[in-house]
UniProtKB/Swiss-Prot annotation:
Originating organism: Xenopus laevis
First and last residues of every Annexin repeat: 209-279, 280-351, 364-436, 440-511
Listed name of the protein: Annexin A7
GO MF annotation list: calcium ion binding; calcium-dependent phospholipid binding; phosphatidylserine binding
Keyword ATP-binding: no
Keywords (A to Z) from UniProt: Annexin, Calcium, Calcium/phospholipid-binding, Repeat
Function: Calcium/phospholipid-binding protein which promotes membrane fusion and is involved in exocytosis.
Bias kind Low complexity: ranges: 14-38, 164-182
Domain-level remarks: A pair of annexin repeats may form one binding site for calcium and phospholipid.
Keyword Cell cycle part of the UniProt annotation: no
Similarity comment: family membership: Belongs to the annexin family.
Compositional bias (Gly residues): 39-52
């Protein structure tokens, strides 16, 4: 889709116009583990106080129905008010080791969105420059979100030990999450954890990286960006972390904003792709969600693509970034833009993001959850939607994979196909996305890429978003799955649906 960009940075709201920088504060590990349901299913979300105590017995939702808008019962802490969270050690194979900057990086100037009447209010205008030591304030002058930094599990490449002038400090390495009991049966490691860490992206941090040299190359080639291969090589073959350092070096050396200069030379899909590449990954997710809900209409598939596929640590950082940059509670926006079981699924997923994701699997709990799902669907007349919501929205991805395997043993049916028979619409798509990411995440993005290029026309925003966000995570596996499923390489599909500099950049990012 197309966005109407104001002058300067193309429509991407700048950080509130304060001068101080936003270094990550000392982080603390957030207690890890999943919610261990008590006998009878276990309530969800956590009990009063916002802690990680095992929830009491009883089903979800509570007897009085789902919680009213404004938050979960029992004192669930608000997202933005929490301290900074350290990324869980090891993550799920989502990117490079710690070293990525916080999402507050230099270069995003220009006024904020001009929201249509009746839509979202525009974020605070004004960009930000190379940050000195201090802290960015949140919208409206509130103190900055303490300790928020880009998690290692979503880092797009690791930076070197040195820092350019004006560069953001490196991320504090995440602490290993403390163990949380997973239920009555001993937790057992799962092969899924190893499979997740085996994924790889097409872009890796460039060796012998020189941010100032790259900034000079971009400045010299600015006029011929659409035809000169040098700037394409620089942008498409640097990690996200390295691109942030290039922006800082450009501003330090020339006193100009790289993004504004690029925008003056670019337009259309090339512009959208370049801006996406230069956005820090957490900010890009938050920005995409904001655009999916602002103004008239809602892009539900964007909500599904991001919220149903990200890890817990990624979700909580997206929630905090959304609040910091747009001055809005993402939960309130979701409640106002969605409804019914789809709304409850998304809200439950965000609640799951409060805790660190465990890589252990409780096999006894998986069997119990499989029985619960069978009794909620195939084993009764009608469908108990709340039971599906409880299991699929609150369990970790490794645990859900074990649930799917247990379900197949119990019913001799595939849980994905059962969801297709029991649900329809966006709730079906959302539940399937969660489960597919638990079983094999690259397959979900493979199918999304195929749909973005299927038929007449191309969904360029989806194509750009997936290629960019998965380029340092699992795009290699997505490409392999694509050719196996469709007997056509992803590069061939991109080549037949795009052209010019836009095509060359997409192919370069995808490792062609």
């Amino acid at each position: 889709m197309s966005y109407q960009y104001p002058s300067g940075f193309p429509g991407y709201p700048g950080y509130p116009g304060g001068d101080p920088s936003y270094p990550p504060a000392a982080q603390q590990a957030f207690p890890g583990g999943q919610f261990p349901p008590a006998a009878g299913g276990g309530a969800f979300p956590p009990a009063s106080g916002g802690g990680n105590a095992p929830p009491p017995g009883g089903g979800y939702p509570h007897a009085g129905g789902y919680p009213a808008p404004g938050g979960y019962p029992g004192g669930m802490p608000s997202y933005p008010g929490a301290p900074g969270f350290g990324a869980p050690a090891g993550g799920q194979g989502y990117g490079a080791p710690p070293g990525a900057p916080a999402y507050g990086v230099p270069g995003y100037g220009g006024p904020g969105f001009n929201a249509p009447a009746g839509g979202y209010g525009a974020p605070n205008a004004g960009g930000f420059g190379v940050p000195p030591a201090g802290g960015y304030g949140s919208p409206g002058g509130a103190p900055g979100y303490g300790g928020f930094s880009q998690p290692s599990s979503q880092s797009y490449g690791a930076g070197g030990p040195g820092q350019m002038p004006g560069q953001m400090p490196g991320q504090m390495p995440g602490q290993a999450p403390s163990g949380y009991p997973s239920g009555p049966a001993p937790a057992q490691p799962t092969p899924y954890a190893a499979a997740m860490t085996a994924t790889q992206g097409t872009i890796k941090a460039a060796p012998n990286f020189d941010a100032l040299s790259d900034a000079e190359k971009l400045r010299k080639a600015m006029k011929g960006f659409g035809t000169d291969e040098k700037p394409i090589d620089v942008v498409a073959n640097r990690s996200n972390d390295q691109r942030q350092k290039i922006q800082a070096a450009f501003k330090t050396a020339y006193g100009k904003d790289l993004i504004k200069d690029l925008k003056s030379e670019l337009s259309g899909n090339v512009e959208e792709l370049i801006i996406a590449l230069f956005m820090p990954s957490t900010y890009y997710d938050a920005w995409s969600l904001y655009n999916a809900m602002k103004g008239a209409g809602t892009q539900e598939r964007v909500l599904i693509e991001i919220l149903c596929t990200r890890t817990n640590s990624e979700i909580r950082n997206i929630v905090a970034c959304y609040k910091q940059e747009f001055g809005r509670e993402i939960e309130k926006d979701i409640r106002s833009d969605t409804s019914g079981h789809f709304e409850r699924l998304l809200i439950s997923i965000m609640a799951r993001g409060i805790v660190d994701e465990s890589q252990n699997v409780n096999m006894q709990q998986a069997e119990q959850d499989a029985q619960r799902l069978y009794q909620a669907g195939e084993g009764k007349l009608g469908t108990d939607e709340s039971s599906f919501n409880l299991v699929l929205a609150s369990r970790s991805f490794p645990q859900l994979k074990a649930v799917a395997e247990a379900y197949a043993r119990i019913s001799k049916r595939d849980l994905l196909s059962v969801i297709g028979r029991e649900f329809s619409g966006y709730i079906e798509d959302g539940l399937k996305a969660v489960l597919q990411c638990a079983i094999n995440r690259p397959l979900f993005f493979r199918d999304r890429l195929c749909r973005s290029m299927k038929g007449a026309g191309t969904d360029d925003s989806t194509l750009i978003r997936i290629i960019v966000t998965r380029s340092e995570i699992d795009l290699v596996q997505i490409k392999q799955a694509y050719v196996q499923m469709y007997q056509k390489s992803l590069s061939a599909a991109i080549s037949s649906d795009t052209s010019g500099a836009y095509k060359r950049m997409l192919l370069a990012i995808s490792g062609h």
